[in-house]
């Protein structure tokens, strides 16, 4: 239907425009009126998109030709209110399609008005489809991006310390990719979001230590202390990965019992077991210990020597940690009925900077303990037993250690014969106990000193395999040795790891530190392995076939 063109003079008032609108409305109503039968009483509109809505919309422009005439239906004011801001233009109107209402005189059908709006739909609008169901109009307009995240933390061996997951927003991830990382440091190719952070895969450029420093500075400038960066090795493909986590997920675990109280309690028990270990009479009958406490004074000298070796071990850890900026928790001395003590368990509280720093701290304890223990062991073999302190033993006891047995054969010579009792200075056994405590802590397993040394030298993947092998061999030894049995139980429940991630795990330590680490592992192995050769050369014929 085409309306005839109309014109009006510029002097006509806005009332004429309203009258013209009423005229146009009556023409439109006449053209869109539906019969009472044959078509539905209500006109159903199905809007598929904003584009189709605009195509179906009808807009009529009416220009007044005559003087103002009265509005026939009197609905002009109400419809102008519905039009809102669009009604401010007197010559352009959005026209309402009506199928009849209770107030309409031209149609007797009881149907409600259907309004077509030419404005774009907002996200809160709904549109009725042909079946009368309401559907959101924003389905075709909303661009909501849903990011799936993996459970837990992207860091190896880290647990989520918070009750609720802390996710990094997508806007922050984009800033990290585009502005924090870059071609000169770490070129990101993909990312894997987690509840506790995000893991970036890509290509590392330049030296890892320098790249880490650059990325950390950019991260600090963009977000302050909100996030923490880690450069690790992906165990799946041995390629570098970058991990960014919120610092609040790195909060240390809290314990119900204060650390100093627990450490003091373990320390008191350890002192008692060190004294008890050096009193053979009480070892045979532990139940009589509290009835014969005065006998414990006989074990003071031996307890002091062993405690000195353990103490030097822990002091070396503390000094090395202070030099590298590593914070250590209070050491827990573990008591042992067999050798007096298993040494101390010392947790690392903060995040270690790199593998070389970890190697310095982990190797410092065994290096100091082995050094003091070895010197005291040599003195024990060299010094003759003094009056009242000589200890008579069977030389077969030296077969339990390759190092001690070899030194005994080298120093004592022909005096060392199978089946012949031998009087030695008790300093040998006291120092031997200290060496054994250092040796079992140097086993490359879990979070022991040896496990940390292996991790620092060869990385997480290789050290985890060595740790599994060491624990397996230790478990086999536990079938024949009670010390090994208790030690493997202790490792499994308290020290099995994994080791907490370092800030930068890619850079290897310097060769001189690696040499020290290898020497410590070998020395501990010599202390623990048995001496297989007979002390008397004449007995070699017993092994001939």
UniProtKB/Swiss-Prot annotation:
Where in or outside the cell is it found?
A: Plastid, Chloroplast membrane
Instruction: Tell me the domain of life.
Output: Eukaryota
Its membrane topology is listed as:
Multi-pass membrane protein
Question: Which parts of the chain span the membrane according to its record?
Answer: 256-276, 300-320, 325-345, 363-383, 426-446, 473-493, 513-533
Using the UniProt record, give the first listed, main subcellular location.
plastid
GO MF, one term, reads: metallopeptidase activity
What UniProt keywords are attached to this protein's entry? Chloroplast, Hydrolase, Membrane, Metalloprotease, Plastid, Protease, Transit peptide, Transmembrane, Transmembrane helix
Q: What residue spans carry the Polar residues bias annotation?
A: 88-109, 117-129
What ranges does the record give for the region Disordered, renumbered to this chain? 66-142
Q: Name one GO biological process term.
A: proteolysis
Q: Where is the transit peptide?
A: 1-63
Provide the Gene Ontology terms for cellular component. chloroplast membrane
Which family, according to the similarity comment? Belongs to the peptidase M50B family.
Alphabetized PANTHER family for the sequence: ZINC METALLOPROTEASE EGY1, ZINC METALLOPROTEASE EGY2, CHLOROPLASTIC-RELATED
Per the entry, what this protein does is: Probable membrane-associated metalloprotease that may be involved in chloroplast development.
Question: What protein is this chain from?
Answer: Probable zinc metalloprotease EGY2, chloroplastic
Question: Which organism is this protein's natural source?
Answer: Oryza sativa subsp. indica
Gene name, please? EGY2
């Amino acid at each position: 239907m085409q309306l005839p063109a109309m014109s009006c003079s510029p002097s006509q008032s806005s009332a004429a425009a309203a009258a013209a609108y009423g005229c146009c409305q009556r023409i439109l109503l006449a053209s869109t009126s539906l019969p009472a039968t044959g078509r539905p009483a209500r006109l159903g509109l199905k809007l598929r998109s904003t584009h189709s809505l605009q195509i179906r919309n009808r807009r009529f422009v009416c220009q007044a030709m005559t003087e103002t005439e009265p509005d026939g239906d009197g609905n002009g004011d109400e419809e102008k209110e519905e039009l809102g801001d669009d009604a401010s233009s007197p010559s352009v109107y959005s026209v309402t399609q009506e199928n009849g209402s209770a107030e309409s005189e031209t149609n007797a059908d009881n149907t409600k008005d259907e309004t077509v709006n030419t404005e774009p739909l907002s996200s809160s609008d709904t549109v009725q489809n042909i079946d009368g169901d309401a559907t959101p109009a924003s389905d075709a307009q909303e661009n909501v991006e849903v990011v799936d995240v993996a459970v837990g933390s992207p860091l190896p061996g880290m647990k989520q310390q918070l009750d609720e997951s802390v996710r990094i927003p997508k806007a922050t991830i984009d800033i990290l990719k585009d502005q924090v990382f870059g071609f000169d440091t770490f070129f990101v190719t993909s990312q894997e979001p987690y509840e506790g952070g995000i893991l970036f895969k890509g290509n590392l450029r330049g030296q890892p230590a320098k790249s880490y420093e650059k990325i950390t500075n950019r991260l600090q400038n963009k977000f302050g202390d909100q996030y923490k960066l880690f450069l690790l090795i992906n165990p799946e493909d041995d390629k570098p990965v970058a991990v960014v986590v919120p610092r609040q997920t790195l909060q240390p675990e809290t314990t119900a019992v204060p650390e100093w109280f627990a450490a003091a309690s373990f320390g008191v028990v350890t002192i008692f077991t060190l004294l008890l270990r050096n009193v053979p009479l009480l070892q045979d009958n532990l139940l009589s210990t509290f009835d014969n406490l005065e006998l414990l004074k006989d074990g003071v000298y031996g307890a002091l020597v062993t405690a000195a070796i353990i103490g030097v071990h822990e002091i070396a850890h503390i000094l090395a940690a202070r030099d590298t900026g590593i914070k250590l928790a209070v050491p827990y001395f573990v008591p042992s009925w067999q050798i007096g003590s298993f040494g101390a368990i010392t947790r690392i509280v903060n995040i270690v900077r790199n593998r070389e720093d970890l190697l310095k701290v982990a190797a410092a304890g065994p290096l100091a303990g082995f050094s003091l223990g070895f010197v005291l062991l040599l003195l024990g073999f060299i010094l003759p037993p003094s009056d009242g302190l000589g200890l008579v033993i069977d030389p077969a006891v030296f077969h339990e250690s390759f190092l001690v047995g070899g030194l005994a054969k080298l120093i004592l010579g022909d005096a060392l014969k199978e089946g012949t009792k031998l009087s030695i200075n008790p300093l040998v056994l006291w120092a031997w106990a200290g060496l054994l405590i250092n040796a079992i802590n140097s086993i490359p397993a879990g979070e022991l000193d040896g496990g940390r040394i292996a991790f620092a030298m060869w990385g997480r993947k290789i050290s985890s395999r060595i740790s599994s092998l060491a624990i397996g061999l230790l478990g086999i030894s536990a079938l024949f040795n009670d010390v090994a049995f208790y030690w493997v139980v202790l490792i499994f429940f308290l020290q099995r790891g994994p080791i907490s991630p370092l800030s930068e795990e890619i850079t290897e330590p310097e060769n001189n530190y690696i040499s020290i680490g290898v020497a410590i592992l070998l020395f501990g192995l010599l202390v623990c392995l048995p001496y297989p050769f007979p002390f008397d050369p004449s007995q070699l014929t017993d092994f001939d076939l």
